[in-house]
A protein has these predicted regions:
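Non-catalytic peripheral regions of patatin-like phospholipases
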Residues: 1-132
């Protein structure tokens, strides 16, 4: 944060935080375990940022950086449906599909939140602190 002049951070989330249903097969359980493990670290970091933003003193140089931080999140429903095995696919057609899904997600995000960038967070980190 200290090395960057931008106060906006854009999180491109490709692993879903929640999935419908309960995994039943060993493969599905392992895939979900990998997603939960990755997301646990991400959510811990985001919660830490949310807490720092709440307690930071805006007048303090370091506190001003945290207090002024703006968070945005780009998600894709279609990408969240992809299983863990998709991370091993290196075929050109599939990579082009991922590129197109990413562009579509970015366009949707910008249509909804372009005016937020540079002004305010479009992702409410404080919701992550509920129950903490």
């Amino acid at each position: 944060m200290r090395e960057c002049r931008s106060h906006d951070t854009i999180l491109v989330q490709i692993n879903p935080v929640e999935r419908q249903g309960t995994p039943r097969s060993a493969r599905d359980i392992l895939n979900r375990l990998n997603e939960v493990s990755f997301n646990a670290v991400l959510l811990k970091e985001l919660r830490m940022i949310a807490m720092l933003r709440q307690v930071a003193e805006p007048g303090n140089c370091e506190g001003a950086l945290w207090a002024g931080m703006r968070i945005h999140r780009v998600t894709s429903e279609e990408m969240s449906l992809l299983g863990a095995s998709s991370k091993l696919i290196a075929e050109w057609e599939f990579l082009c599909k991922l590129r197109d899904l990413g562009r579509s997600a970015a366009e949707s995000f910008l249509a909804a939140h372009a005016s937020d960038i540079g002004q305010r967070s479009s992702y409410d980190l404080d919701t992550l602190l509920k129950g903490v």
